[in-house]
Amino acid sequence: MTAKTYVNIEIQDEVFIARLFGGLDHHSVQPLREEIDAMALQNRPKELILDFAGVGFMDSSGIGLVMGRYKLAQELGAELRLCGLTAGSKRVMQIAGMDKLAKF
């Protein structure tokens, strides 16, 4: 049995926090992208935070999720931050160059 993948979005002032839960793969990421993008475009935050603390598994789709939200943050004039990454996931993100796009 696989854990349900979902996002819990919290907005405080101009800070947008997307708390991700479950496994991130090519099957589960698209609905998360759509929900995050719709809420961010509606609220136009100055800071966009992706919290990976609730993520149990992530394939390269997680990198794609970050890259797409970086582009969205650029459109909004917002800063992108990543938090809650495991040491292994953080290293993979760094190898992929995500530390050039987002603050960890």
Predicted regions and their residues:
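Short beta-strand/loop segment at the start of cytosolic alpha/beta domains
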Residues: 1-19
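Amphipathic alpha-helical interaction surfaces in cytosolic regulatory modules
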Residues: 23-101
